[in-house]
Each structure stands twice: as C-alpha cells, then as structure tokens.
C-alpha cells in the first residue's frame, strides 16, 4: 500500500 509522499509502506 502506498501512502504519504512518494513512499510505499503499510498504512
């Protein structure tokens, strides 16, 4: 899952 600014990590 991608969230934040151009960062992909578990939300």
Curated annotation (Swiss-Prot):
This is Chi-conotoxin CMrVIA. It is found in: Secreted. Its main location: secreted. The cysteine framework is X (CC-CX[hydroxyPro]C). The keyword Secreted applies. Disulfide bonds join 2-11, 3-8. It comes from Conus marmoreus (Marble cone). Expressed by the venom duct. Belongs to the conotoxin T superfamily. Chi-conotoxins inhibit the neuronal noradrenaline transporter (NET/SLC6A2). The keyword Secreted applies. One of its GO terms (cellular component) is extracellular region. GO terms for molecular function: toxin activity. Keywords: Disulfide bond, Hydroxylation, Neurotoxin, Secreted, Toxin. The modification 4-hydroxyproline is found at residue 10.
